[in-house]
Amino acid sequence: MDAIKKKMVAMKMEKKNALDRAEQLEQKLRETEEAKAKIEDDYNSLVKKNIQTENDYDNCNTQLQDVQAKYERAEKQIQEHEQEIQSLTRKISLLEEGIMKAEERFTTASGKLEEASKAADESERNRKVLENLNSGNDERIDQLEKQLTEAKWIAEEADKKYEEAARKLAITEVDLERAEARLEAAEAKVIDLEEQLTVVGANIKTLQVQNDQASQREDSYEETIRDLTNRLKDAENRATEAERTVSKLQKEVDRLEDELLTEKEKYKAISDELDATFAELAGY
């Protein structure tokens, strides 16, 4: 009887210990599940941060490309304006040369006109001399008539030269007016281009400032990208470590569940044995 009582006491103690171990295992299992859930939350947070980091990286690259494109367009516009200014400068030089040649032709024509006028005056004087002469021999008259004829011919030639000079002068004046009109248009174009160049210069300064700022932002972006890359690597390492930790915890959970199941089976066996013992005692 004492042996049975001792056995019952031992079985009760073993049952109590099994219950305690089962409670401890359940508590440990709950803590493990909570730790697993926390690690999974941290892992999800790291994944979100990783996605945000990649988005920030893409935005930085996009802004940098936009700044570079604007700078290239500004450089192209400046080159086009410079080429246009050079072309107009060449045209102005050609117009100035044309004006100088026209002035030379005008000076030559004026000289010829003056010579023709002098010849006409001389012929007129000879004609008056002939009219005033009332006497003289026929030879003198013939000579004077010849001189008169020659004077008329010289006057006619002078008139022709004068008309040709006047015609050339008129053409020269038309050419000069056209050249002056082209020159005025060119000067207006130059003024307009100078104004545009001033605007472009201001834009260049603005772009240079923006470029400097963009360079600073680019340096900042590069620093940010390096920081984000390091953070990304750190996040990936932490995510990898978290995955390993989750895997280890999952194994621990599985082990604890197996151990809990074993303890429950032991508890059931002890309970069955106690029930059998009580039934045996009741039979006495």
Curated annotation (Swiss-Prot):
Keyword match Repeat: yes
Q: Per its UniProt record, what PROSITE patterns does this chain match?
A: TROPOMYOSIN
GO terms for MF: protein homodimerization activity
Q: Where is the composition biased (Basic and acidic residues)?
A: 110-130
Q: Which SUPFAM superfamilies match?
A: Tropomyosin
- Lineage top rank: taxon: Eukaryota
Which GO annotations describe the biological process of this protein?
Answer: regulation of muscle contraction
| InterPro entries assigned | Tropomyosin (IPR000533)
Annotated region (Disordered), positions in chain: 110-134
**Is-annotated flag, keyword Coiled coil?**
yes
Family classification? Belongs to the tropomyosin family.
Entry note about domains: The molecule is in a coiled coil structure that is formed by 2 polypeptide chains. The sequence exhibits a prominent seven-residues periodicity.
Output this protein's name: Tropomyosin
Q: Which organism is it from?
A: Perna viridis (Asian green mussel)
